[in-house]
Amino acid sequence: MKKILILLLIAASVPSFSQNSIWLEKGKGDALVVAEFKHTPNDSIFNYIYVESDFSKHNDTRSTYVLISRDQKWWKAPVWVHGEIRTFVGKNFTMDNVFLIGPMFELTGGKLGFINLQTMYRYDGKSNFQITFLSDVEYGRFLYSMYADLYGSDRLYMHSENRFFFKVIPHIRIGANLVLTNGEISEDFDFKPMAVLRIDL
């Protein structure tokens, strides 16, 4: 409950962001609280902040994940300079950081949403690469939001989250998050469905 209140206070203290939301996600053995802050590119120091806190009892390795990103361009072409920092904070306040930078290509965009592709240099203690697909599509009461990371480290990894939302009333959405992960690209995929309650602030 304390983590939920902390994230609500964070959301209330970031009025400059144009889209703020809090999510509660629950799956088998998992319980997450997520805060998301979005802003129009070029209009703020950071365009996107994502904070995910895991308060499930089984998690003894990592408690909080933070992603901060910035998109910038000085031309009309649909290509952005994209940079981000990802931080994993353990329960004993141990920290692992990942730094990414590279071009973000706007594959399609319009009133319904967008599809973007990021091809980035990745540094997590050693130099490597990462490819990320992003998409947000909203039609009526329905919203589909996804991202998929394919990256190298000591081997090839993949992580994808697909969120489906239905707007029940203004500011309240319910839905599901389908998480697909592979620790090594040749191994079997781990599929994890989660129920989601989203509050748009």
Where are the regions that the model predicts?
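Sec-dependent N-terminal signal peptides
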Residues: 3-18
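Mid-chain, structured segments of secreted extracytoplasmic proteins
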Residues: 56-95
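Generic structural motif
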Residues: 20-24, 81, 144, 174
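Short glycine/proline- and aromatic-enriched beta-strand/turn motifs that initiate or cap beta-hairpins
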Residues: 17-59, 63-65
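Outer membrane beta-barrel
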Residues: 34, 44-48, 77-82, 95, ...
